[in-house]
UniProtKB/Swiss-Prot annotation:
Cited Pfam families: Methyltransf_5 (PF01795)
GO cellular component term of the entry, any: cytoplasm
Class of enzymatic activity (EC top level): transferase
SUPFAM superfamilies (alphabetical): Putative methyltransferase TM0872, insert domain, S-adenosyl-L-methionine-dependent methyltransferases
PANTHER family: 12S RRNA N4-METHYLCYTIDINE METHYLTRANSFERASE (PTHR11265:SF0), S-ADENOSYL-METHYLTRANSFERASE MRAW (PTHR11265)
Protein family membership: Belongs to the methyltransferase superfamily. RsmH family.
Protein name (record): Ribosomal RNA small subunit methyltransferase H
Entry's EC annotation: 2.1.1.199
GO MF annotations in UniProt: rRNA (cytosine-N4-)-methyltransferase activity
Alphabetic keyword roster: Cytoplasm, Methyltransferase, rRNA processing, S-adenosyl-L-methionine, Transferase
Organism: Shewanella sp. (strain W3-18-1)
GO biological process, one term: rRNA base methylation
Amino acid sequence: MSQEFAHLSVLLAETVGGLNIKDDGIYIDGTFGRGGHSRQILQRLGDNGRLIAIDRDPQAIEAAKQFSDDPRFQIVHGGFGQLADYVEDLGLVGKIDGVLLDLGVSSPQLDDAERGFSFLRDGPLDMRMDNSQGQTAAQWLAHAEIEDMAWVFKTYGEEKNARHIARCIAADRDKTPFLRTKDLADLIARITKNKERNKHPATRVFQAIRIYINSELDQIDQALEGALAVLAPQGRLSIISFHSLEDRIVKRFIRRHSQGESVPYGLPITEDQINKSRKLRAIGKAIMPSDEEIERNARARSSVLRIAERLDY
């Protein structure tokens, strides 16, 4: 594999192990990235197994050529939020034995200054997961209303100074448009008074813009519902989150479908009826990276893995 595609997959053994892979199973890697998880899945699959990988990043699609000679593997260019549509097109609804999602931005995307994801590397202010379509971060910042920017920074970045930062961006962009990551990062650093220890002042705003530009949380919601719809009985969900917004969505989804439908107090309903409304069961507790993994890969520090199984009712 070339250096361009080098990437350390987080919680690799735990995430793939959580799929409980069968020799002849059919699995989905909804976030192919550079193929770390897919490679491990293929190594565990037998000759009759199948892996469907998905990614909306054109560079990831290029990286998937490393598996082009493996008849068990296929890659789909698109967002994982549409995974149920892809599965339906293949006639595999109810036959998927496991879905893996590694949420957020990948290391290659962060490390490539030209992608515009990182405030530590100067490059075009882009931030699109699929840089072949959609508006860039620079285009959005050039026209967004102050209220809209403040809402995005607060909602998706949990930024305390959201309104102040939005006002400053609006005031400065009339003189000089924000076209590069350094332009935005420098402004935020300059206007932020109470800086968090060991955290760049632009961290939360960059996260918020990235999530908004790529509709990341909507994609997660759609992917979870889609996975539930296509999983076979005893099929597994194995999902890595990297910040509280992602993990909260995953945690609540698993909890909601593990508890079953809520019914009004006093409504006559049997235990069997309640059980039949339960669609998932959580497998163990949330898994965090070991100290050893964090030492090898600092970006693993904030990762959380949750595993769930589709119930057979």
